[in-house]
């Protein structure tokens, strides 16, 4: 680590801290004006963003990156439209800052309010998803936080082009341009500086990327972290499930987009309906281009599958691969999920209410779904506008991290001259 990088990052932290103060008291109208102007700027810069993305994609191809990686990196007309729409959706959300979460009166006449406040400065470290630049910048802005963005070198051109549009939004609303900053160096030493907190400037770190990145952040960070290590998501088909529904959900949960953290990685089927449900579901997946890795029982019923290893049950493929096992009803599903899950997202297809109740009560994951695809594990789908990530820990934020999760709170106590005496 060079002294120059430490100095550069210290200056980034200083600017962010300075910008956080006026941003914390910005009006909802100011923040929304900045967000809508940023969305306009992204659409106006569409050609520049696509050209920048082509440079990143060319480098990815040159470096032989996996198809799932390239998918996460790729921008097109529709995805740019979606980025702009996501920013506008965030602008329509209620302003969390200043919201009174709870209030009560004490016998001595004191009136107490618990009120949402910004966290301060958020550091976001991510890899190949250029859309995170927009999502993180917009969410932090709406919640009154300054943000320092450190994208991976693989998406550097795309992220820089999107970042320029975000700054235009800030300037249009007369908000500090330094409220959203992108780390100006690609050296990994910059990440190390962020994990130290930049001399107290950073209040929380949000990593969004692969297992090695998140593990490093959790290991080295000297500030709080909102993180998930991986998305080992399960889909359980119960004996009470409607087969047509199960087929639709299984195909979507795995194959809609295989490279996202909400994609199903393991399919569990109730042994009681294996003879009727397994082959149609796996046939759909195989026809869609998915590789099936099954337990010995699955292979006996579906010989086209490949043998699953012990490692498969704890692997996040992020690819067109799924591991499949038969289980003894809801009890077997709960046991398997609690053993192998990363506590991200699990789904059940079932019509029996008691079975669904057990699934919801006995599985400790951030997101649980009934009769719906795991791919709904997304802040946008939850009505949050977008998300900065999905947290699987239990402290402060859990599940999609949207504007509310990017706030803290303080107490306002109103009296009329009371003393304790």
From Swiss-Prot:
First-level EC class? oxidoreductase
Q: Which reaction does it catalyse?
A: L-glutamate 5-semialdehyde + phosphate + NADP(+) = L-glutamyl 5-phosphate + NADPH + H(+)
Q: For this protein, what is any one GO molecular function term?
A: glutamate-5-semialdehyde dehydrogenase activity
Single GO BP term: L-proline biosynthetic process
- InterPro entries, per this entry? Ald_DH/histidinol_DH, Ald_DH_C, Ald_DH_N, Aldehyde_DH_dom, G-glutamylP_reductase_CS, Glu-5-SA_DH, GPR_dom
What disulfide bonds does the UniProt entry report for this chain?
none
Its keywords, alphabetically, are: Amino-acid biosynthesis, Cytoplasm, NADP, Oxidoreductase, Proline biosynthesis
Q: In which pathway does it act?
A: Amino-acid biosynthesis; L-proline biosynthesis; L-glutamate 5-semialdehyde from L-glutamate: step 2/2
PROSITE patterns annotated for this entry?
PROA
The subcellular localization recorded is: Cytoplasm
Recorded GO cellular component terms are: cytoplasm
What is the E.C. number?
1.2.1.41
> NCBIfam families of this UniProt entry?
PRK00197.1, proA
- Describe its function: Catalyzes the NADPH-dependent reduction of L-glutamate 5-phosphate into L-glutamate 5-semialdehyde and phosphate. The product spontaneously undergoes cyclization to form 1-pyrroline-5-carboxylate.
The protein's matches in PANTHER family, at most eight in alphabetical order, are given as: DELTA-1-PYRROLINE-5-CARBOXYLATE SYNTHASE (PTHR11063:SF8), GLUTAMATE SEMIALDEHYDE DEHYDROGENASE (PTHR11063)
The protein here is known as: Gamma-glutamyl phosphate reductase
């Amino acid at each position: 680590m060079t002294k120059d990088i430490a100095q550069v990052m210290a200056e980034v932290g200083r600017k962010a801290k300075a910008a956080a103060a006026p941003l914390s008291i910005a009006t909802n109208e100011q923040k929304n004006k900045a967000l809508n102007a940023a969305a306009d700027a992204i659409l106006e810069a569409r050609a520049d963003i696509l050209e920048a993305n082509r440079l990143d994609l060319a480098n990815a191809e040159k470096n032989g990156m996996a198809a799932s990686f390239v998918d996460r990196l790729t921008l097109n007309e529709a995805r740019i439209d979606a980025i702009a729409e996501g920013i506008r959706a965030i602008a329509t959300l209620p302003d969390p800052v200043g919201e009174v979460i709870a209030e009560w009166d004490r016998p001595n006449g004191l009136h107490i309010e618990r009120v949402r406040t910004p966290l301060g400065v958020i550091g976001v470290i991510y890899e190949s998803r250029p859309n995170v630049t927009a999502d993180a910048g917009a969410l932090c802005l709406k919640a009154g936080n300054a943000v320092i963005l450190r994208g991976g070198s693989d998406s550097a051109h795309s992220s820089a082009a999107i970042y320029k549009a975000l700054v235009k939004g800030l300037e249009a609303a007369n908000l500090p341009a330094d409220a959203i900053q992108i780390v100006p160096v690609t050296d990994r030493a910059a990440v190390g500086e962020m994990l130290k907190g930049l001399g107290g400037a950073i209040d929380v770190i949000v990593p969004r990327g692969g297992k090695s990145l998140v593990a490093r952040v959790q290991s080295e960070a000297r500030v709080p972290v909102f993180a998930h290590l991986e998305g080992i998501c399960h889909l359980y088909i119960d004996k009470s499930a409607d087969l047509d529904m199960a087929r639709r959900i299984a195909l979507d949960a795995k194959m809609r987009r295989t490279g996202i953290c909400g994609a199903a990685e393991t399919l569990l089927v109730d042994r009681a309906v294996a003879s009727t449900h397994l082959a149609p579901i796996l046939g759909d997946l195989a026809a869609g281009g998915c590789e099936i890795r099954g337990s010995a029982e699955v292979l006996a019923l579906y010989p086209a599958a490949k043998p699953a290893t012990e490692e498969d049950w704890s692997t996040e493929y992020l690819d067109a691969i799924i591991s499949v096992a038969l289980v003894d009803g809801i009890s077997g599903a709960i046991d398997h999920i609690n053993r192998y899950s990363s506590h991200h997202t699990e789904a059940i297809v079932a019509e029996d209410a008691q079975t669904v109740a057990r699934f919801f009560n006995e599985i400790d994951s951030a997101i649980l779904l009934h009769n719906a695809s795991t791919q709904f594990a997304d802040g946008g789908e939850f009505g949050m506008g977008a998300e900065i990530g999905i947290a699987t820990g239990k402290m402060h934020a859990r599940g999609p991290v949207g504007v509310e999760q990017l706030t803290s709170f303080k107490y306002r106590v109103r009296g009329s001259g009371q003393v304790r005496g």
